[in-house]
Amino acid sequence: MAVAWRPALPLITILALIVYEERVSIPSCKIVLGAADLSQPATEFVEDPEDLKVMMVANLLLLGSEAGFVELYFRDYYMTKFFRKSFEILNPDMLLVLGDISAKGSELTRAKWVSVLHQFHGLLGPFLGLPYHVILGDRDIGQCSSLNVKSVNWVASNFPGLDWAGCGAFEISNISFVSLNSVSLLCGINNLRFGVERVVERESVELQMEAEDATEPVNEYSEIREINHNFGWKANTISSGSGPVLLLHFPLHRTADGSCSAVDSFGKSLKLSRESSNAPDGRGLVGIGPYKLLHTLPPNVTEYIFQALKPRIVFSAHTHGFCDHLHPDGTREVTVPAMTWNSGDDPGFVVATFHRNRKAVSVSYCSLARESHVIVAYISFTVVFVLTMLIAKPPLLRCLRR
């Protein structure tokens, strides 16, 4: 009876590998409780069909035409599976990409950028049928010394909803989002920074017009248009958290030790923004980017944004690690981890649920399979497959023994 099963052993091994590939691409997600969530009863976390569920990824670090064999047929293959399986299981309403789509975008010609865009669209798969928004990172457009209005405008024109300065503002399901080109906010006086300031002004005026009488905003508009390019602002009496959802690539400045804490799917403390960034850069697989992982927006820019926009919640990226931080004014900032094996062995993403019946936002941290685990699994399957082939064909085994 055992002999009759021997020829089927290799087939069983192959089927086991197929099942493993499907299972390993399933994300493991866990809700991360913010300070506002701790006071909410458990019933508040029940999903409502009218809630807005947004999947947020960052730091894809695509290589386009410069991708090698391993990149194309292993890492990209699994990243595509991660996107597809996440779409099937989580059923999000929208996708946000918080910068660094390209590993070397600021160094690429337009022809090579096109190959990155093709690779990006290939990865998205089913997400192309959903609303999606992309912001620009330092790897996409470069650092201050190399910022060019024409090149930034060209890159921004390839993504929906971005203006010439790389900023955007949109509303979906009555939730307002504002994305800023945070790279230009690191620089001195330049046209790109002026463009970002104009977006901040406009959104600040609209925020105040919603909260004040129709006659008062007209007077304030003329005052706010007199911009102080050293990031001065007019006093904003609107309470914190009343503004839009803010999307950035660089995190905002953090006071004190800047620590962030949460709990991942394994129950361990997550302090990945500052502490883990002190480890080796993590970008060795794709080179070092223009700015270090510890880089944040300056304190004056951070205060300017808080005063002008009063963001409901802030989502940022760049650090390659997950972080949930509460600023002194009560604003919550969530840093989205890198969703690629190019930046390290611990990829992931964030799912934010904007509830119809309350202001707080539910945030889930989703971890993905480690590259090292997948490689070990492939080696194990290869060894088992060879053994089953030898067992299934005793004559071949006898020949090898001679």
Can you say where each PLM-predicted feature lies in the sequence?
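Solvent-exposed loop/turn segments at secondary-structure junctions
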Residues: 60-63, 101-104, 138-142, 183-187, ...
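Active-site-proximal beta-strand elements of phosphoester/diester hydrolases
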Residues: 51-66, 174-188, 244-249, 313, ...
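Extended active-site neighborhood of metal-dependent phosphoesterases/phosphodiesterases
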Residues: 27-44, 106-241, 259, 265, ...
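N-terminal active-site segment of His-dependent metallophosphoesterases
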Residues: 1-114, 119
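Binuclear metal-dependent phosphoesterase catalytic core
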Residues: 2-9, 13-35, 39, 166, ...
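Loop/turn elements at helix/coil->beta-strand transitions in domains of secreted/extracellular proteins
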Residues: 19-23, 50-53, 91-94, 127-132, ...
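Active-site neighborhood of phospho(di)ester-bond hydrolases with catalytic His/Asp-centered motifs
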Residues: 56-58, 94-100, 131-138, 180, ...
